[in-house]
């Protein structure tokens, strides 16, 4: 089974994701969690395919999956691979990582108009959003079909 869920209250203490992991009756069955933050921005104008790809270091297959899928499916992404095992930042993936649930987290770094009136839809790189979405679909496919964990 695949569960799609959306959280609220991230920036005031991860309220939604914390509540979910504290009350979810099937936490032991969760194989992984995908998180997306600001995936449509071009924060490196010289590299519009840039994306930061955090994943749980104890699961190196997560990094290899993306490398293989970029090559196999021609995804137009230039990932900065960042394996890690300690929750960082204030994003919802931390709620899951603290429960020892492996995570994959797509991010495109900060930008000058973060939380500002100028943060408008015309600044979104829709090609990047599409390629990250395709990669995420393949992540979910791999997670759902992975037998080793």
Please report, for each region that a protein language model flagged, where it lies by residue.
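His/Asp/Glu-rich mid-to-C-terminal helical/loop segments that flank catalytic regions of hydrolases
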Residues: 1-2, 110-149
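Metal-dependent peptidase/peptidase-like ectodomains
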Residues: 7-108
